[in-house]
């Protein structure tokens, strides 16, 4: 869904369909087994895919070198490798929802009442800029018991917290919710864009989900 990426990248076990510059993409990753998460007509599904790598004529301004594509690329949300998955339709709750400060994003799944929320942790003035650090929490409520995990701290430099919840559903088929959500870019979320995949099946005993893959795009 994104056709233009920026200058510096870090890719770990996930990829987007789109164009890449020289040095941004290790073509050896094409030797791995890849899966695509798709959404069409309010149905999400996952299937094994074959990546296509086309060489591009260098652009005077951007110097794009490669184009990554798959069949049905217009409906592809993201690509994965290194995960134990099976081809199937997936129960899912949202794609491209924006989470704002002081807003709970709530949905039901099986025995769990699951919701995300934010909490302002710190406010700091940096020159004329006001930085607000928000903790982002995942919550499971079941049988009157509330279990909470802080997913990450998100520095915000605007007047309002805006985090993109790219996709939420049961990707790993364990009966609990998984997320693809915007995460802060290192070190202080000052530029660029980053997203992370959180899986419930990979969580430690004291966790609800685990960050298992991320994609970082920074630069200008």
Q: Model-predicted segments: where are they?
A:
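Single conserved hydrophobic/aromatic residue that forms the stacking wall/gate
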Residues: 1-11
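Beta-propeller blade repeat segments, especially FG-GAP/WD-type strand-to-loop junctions
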Residues: 190-212
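Repeat-based blade/solenoid architectures
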Residues: 153-166, 216-219
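Solvent-exposed N-terminal domain segments of exported/luminal and surface proteins
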Residues: 13-97
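Extracellular-facing segments of soluble proteins and assemblies that are Gly/Ser/Thr-biased and enriched
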Residues: 64-143
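Acidic/hydrophobic-patterned starts of short beta strands in beta-sheet-rich repeat architectures
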Residues: 173-184
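Surface-exposed loop/turn elements that mediate protein-protein interactions on large endomembrane-trafficking
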Residues: 138-152, 199
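Calcium-coordinating acidic loop motifs
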Residues: 3, 170-172
């Amino acid at each position: 869904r994104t056709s233009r990426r920026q200058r510096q990248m870090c890719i770990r076990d996930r990829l987007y369909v789109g164009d890449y510059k020289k040095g941004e993409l290790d073509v050896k990753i094409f030797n791995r087994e890849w899966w695509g998460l798709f959404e069409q007509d309010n149905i999400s599904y996952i299937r094994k895919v074959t990546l296509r790598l086309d060489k591009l004529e260098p652009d005077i301004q951007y110097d794009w070198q490669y184009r990554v594509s798959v069949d049905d690329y217009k409906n592809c949300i993201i690509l994965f490798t290194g995960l134990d998955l099976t081809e199937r339709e997936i129960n899912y709750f949202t794609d491209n929802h924006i989470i704002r400060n002081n807003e709970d994003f709530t949905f039901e799944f099986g025995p769990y009442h699951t919701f995300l929320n934010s909490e302002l942790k710190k406010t700091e003035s940096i020159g004329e800029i006001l930085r607000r650090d928000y903790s982002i929490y995942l919550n499971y409520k079941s049988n009157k018991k509330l279990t909470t995990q802080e997913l990450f701290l998100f520095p915000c430099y605007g007047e309002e917290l805006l985090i993109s919840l790219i996709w939420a559903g049961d990707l790993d088929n364990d009966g609990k919710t998984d997320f693809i959500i915007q995460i802060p870019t290192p070190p202080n979320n000052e530029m660029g864009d980053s997203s992370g995949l959180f899986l419930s099946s990979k969580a430690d005993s004291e966790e609800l989900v685990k960050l298992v893959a991320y994609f970082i795009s920074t630069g200008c």
